[in-house]
């Protein structure tokens, strides 16, 4: 494998097709020594999200904080629904579990694992505990 620095062909720019992270592309190498190429074609995308612009995702990890800021479960549910709609496997990462004095982590974990989602618990500056 090698890295080739590429720009989109003028035709793609005229059609307002912009390559994004995750795109599968066909390229033409124009300078082997300088590792330069041109993107000739962008293959059909399996999925696409606008913010941040990415394509062909297979999974996405939603990181939520148990405290500071408090987890917004409605927002998390909306993000999960959007991921499912786009055919992207959501994974939930609950961070700052060391600050969970009310045992909220266990409740959140139970809710989401019961409906089939993978939940990872973390203390970002220490370790990851996989479920």
Stretches found by the model and what they are:
Residues 1-73:
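N-terminal accessory targeting/assembly segments
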Residues 22, 83, 95:
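Residue-level signal for inorganic ion chemistry
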Residues 31-33, 66-69, 96-101, 125-128:
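Conserved nucleotide-binding/hydrolysis micro-motifs of P-loop NTPases
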Residues 45, 63, 67, 79-82, ...:
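Conserved, well-folded catalytic cores of nucleic-acid-processing
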Residues 57-64, 86-97, 116-123:
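Conserved beta-strand/loop subsegment of P-loop NTPase cores
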Residues 72-75, 104-105:
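Residues at alpha-helix caps and immediate loop-helix transition turns in enzyme cores, especially N-
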Residues 74-87:
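Histidine-anchored nucleotide/phosphate-binding helix
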Residues 99-131:
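Canonical P-loop GTPase G-domain recognition
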